[in-house]
Amino acid sequence: MLPKFRSRSSIIKNTERISNILSGGKLTVCGSKLGGLYTFEKCTFNKYYSSSQYQHTGRPVGGNIHSSSNQQRQKNSEAPRINEIPPSTSSVEKSTTIPNSSVVLDHLLNEGENTLEEVKPSEIHPHMSWSSKSEGKMFKIPEELLNKLNGFGALEKQKKSFSFFTSASLLHRKITTELVNVLQRSKDQGTKDGRFLLDGAPGSGRSIALIQAELFALSQPNFIVLPVHNCEGWVNSTSSYGYDEQLKLWVQPDLIKGFLTSVMKTNSDKLKKLKTFESHELLQNECIPAGTDLLSFLHKLIASSNAPKSLEIFLQELNNNTKSNSNMKVLLVIDNISILSVVTKYKDKKNNFLPPKDFYFINLLFKYISGSLTFNRGTVLAATSSQPRVSTPSLDIALGVAHRNPYKSSDETILDSLQSVHILNMEPYTLDESRRMMEYLVSSNVCLEKVDNYLQNHVLSGGNPRKFFDACTRLA
C-alpha cells in the first residue's frame, strides 16, 4: 500500500524528499484523482538496484499499485503480492513488475503505518548567540563569515557534509560554550596562560569546535584571527622551500605569503583601525613610517621579497597593538598539530627527510604553543587530527596516551611545547544533542528515518558526531 496524500502539493513535497535522497532517481507524479486522493502513476528509481530500472504504472484505485503482469510475478517469488487489474477496466499501458521494486517503495514510503512521518521544519537561528542558554540549538553561519572561513580553508574537511544542506549550520554544544568562555577570559590575560589543545577520537568534532571559536572571534570587533588550517600543506613537499643561512632554518616563502594574505583578507576591517608603533625599512629606498595602518602595512609586507622578515615584523606590530592600553586580542588557530609533529616529506641536500622543527614557520608555531613567544592578550588554540592517519609517537607521549620508550628517540620540541598546554577533551554527543541533530537532519530531508530513531543511532555511533551523521544518512 502506498501512502494516501490529501493534496497534490503534499505528494510533490514528499516525492521531493525521496528524490533528494536517491541521487540519480526520479519520481513522476500523475494528476489523476479518485475520491480526493492522488496516487503515483509512474516511479523510477535507479540507485539501489543499478542493474535495472524499476517502473510502476498504475491507476488511482485506493492508492494501490496494480499490475497486469502475472507471469513475471510468478517467476519471482520474492516480489511482493500485487493486486491484478481486470483487462476490461485497465485504462493504462501494460506495466512491467521488476523484483524488489515495491520493496524499495515500501522501505521509503510505506514503513509502519503506510505514511511518511511529517516533521516540522527544524528551527535554525539566523543570528548566532554564544551564551550557555544556546546549547542544543542550531545556528546558521552568516554568509559573510562563511566566505571568510572558506577564504582561509577552514571548511575543507566539512565540504562533504555541508553539501547535504542548502545552508551551513552548526550545533551549539557544551564545548562551544567552553571555548567562548576561554576567549572571553580576563582582558589582560595573554597567550602565555592561554594555550589550549583540543583532543579526541576521530570524528569527535575538533575541527568544528575550532570553526566555532573562529566564528566567535570574527564576530567580535576586538579580535584578530590568525588561521592555520590544512597543515598537511606545510609538510607534504608540494611547495617551494630553501635554506636561510641567517635563520639556520628552512623557509617556505610561498606558503608564508599565502598565510599573510589570508590574515589580511580575513581581518581587513579591523587591521585598518590599528597603527604601527615603529618605522620599518623594507628596502634600501623604502621606509614605512610609524603610524601606518596595519592593513596598508601588511599589504606592503606581502609584496616584499623577504617572507620570513615580513612575518616577523607583522607579528611584532600585532603584538604591540595588544598591549594593556588596547582592547585588541589575537586568536591563533592551528588545526592538525598532529601532522606537524612527524617527519616531513621535504628533504635536505643529503636526501634526508627534514623534521618539522627545522622549518621557520612550523618552528614559530611551536614557540607560540610552548609559550616562549606570546601575544600580550589573546589565545592559542590548536587541535589534534586523524586526517591523514599518521603515527604520532612524540605527540602521544606529550598527551599522556603513550609511555616514553628509552630505546627510541622522541622529538623534544614536541614534548617541551606541550608540557604546560591546557588539554580540552572532546566529549560524545549527549542524548539531547543527538536528538537535536536528528531533528535537523530529518527536517532537512537528509535523513529518511523517524526522529525517534535517534536513540538507536546514538547507540550505534557511541555519540561520535561523525559516526552519528553517517548512521543517520546511511540511506542517502
Swiss-Prot record:
Domain of life: Eukaryota
GO molecular function: ATP binding; structural constituent of ribosome
One of the protein's GO biological processes: mitochondrial translation
Cellular compartment(s): Mitochondrion
InterPro entries (alphabetical): Ribosomal_mS29, Ribosomal_mS29_fun
Region (Disordered): 58-97
Positions with biased composition (Polar residues): 65-74, 86-97
Residue span of the annotated presequence: 1-54
UniProt: ATP binding residues: G200, A201, P202, G203, S204, G205, R206, S207
Cystine bridges: none
Keywords: ATP-binding, Mitochondrion, Nucleotide-binding, Ribonucleoprotein, Ribosomal protein, Transit peptide
One Gene Ontology CC term in the entry: mitochondrion
Pfam families associated with the record: DAP3
Annotated family: Belongs to the mitochondrion-specific ribosomal protein mS29 family.
Subunit-structure text: Component of the mitochondrial small ribosomal subunit (mt-SSU). Mature yeast 74S mitochondrial ribosomes consist of a small (37S) and a large (54S) subunit. The 37S small subunit contains a 15S ribosomal RNA (15S mt-rRNA) and at least 32 different proteins. The 54S large subunit contains a 21S rRNA (21S mt-rRNA) and at least 45 different proteins.
PANTHER family given in the database record: MITOCHONDRIAL 28S RIBOSOMAL PROTEIN S29, SMALL RIBOSOMAL SUBUNIT PROTEIN MS29
Function: Component of the mitochondrial ribosome (mitoribosome), a dedicated translation machinery responsible for the synthesis of mitochondrial genome-encoded proteins, including at least some of the essential transmembrane subunits of the mitochondrial respiratory chain. The mitoribosomes are attached to the mitochondrial inner membrane and translation products are cotranslationally integrated into the membrane. mS29 binds GTP and is probably an active GTPase. GTP hydrolysis may be linked to subunit association.
Protein name: Small ribosomal subunit protein mS29
Gene label: rsm23
